[in-house]
Amino acid sequence: PFDFTRRRLSVVVSDGKKKQLITKGAVEEILSICTMVDYKGEVSDITRDIKQNILKITKDLNKQGLRVVAVAQKNDITDVKDFSIKDESKMVLMGFIGFLDPPKESAKGAIERLNQDGIRVIVLTGDNEYVTKAICEKVNINTDKIILGSKVEKLSDAEVEAKRS
């Protein structure tokens, strides 16, 4: 299952001859476990510049409302029974996938009706701030007060209350 702490999921697959570890997850997390990148069939060291370029592309996709997941792999896993988180290292970045999960067509109208009735809509999501902002803008939810979960945890009750108003 997906591990929300590590923000990734790994599986071991076998074709009968070799075992392969495949890991998918948050781009930043996958980049942190990759030492190589497969680009157009050529495997090479993943440099700081390559990582920064991937993060820039990912951010641009997020701003368009796309969620992005990275995929990495590692060949020749020795024993599946002894597989552990430690095996999620020195992996090869295979690529990343952007997908759109747009709000339902009825969402914008429903939110407008709630606002007209004096009900303020608050969004809680596991998405990053760029995806959240793009989706909220599509349904006319104010994006001036986006607070990341990691920051909410550090706020006092009084600070949270001040941000709500």
Which residues make up each language-model segment?
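Cytosolic catalytic headpieces and adjacent flexible linkers of membrane translocases
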Residues: 9-165
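A short, compositionally biased
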Residues: 5-7
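Short Gly/Pro-enriched turn/cap motifs at secondary-structure boundaries
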Residues: 1-3, 162
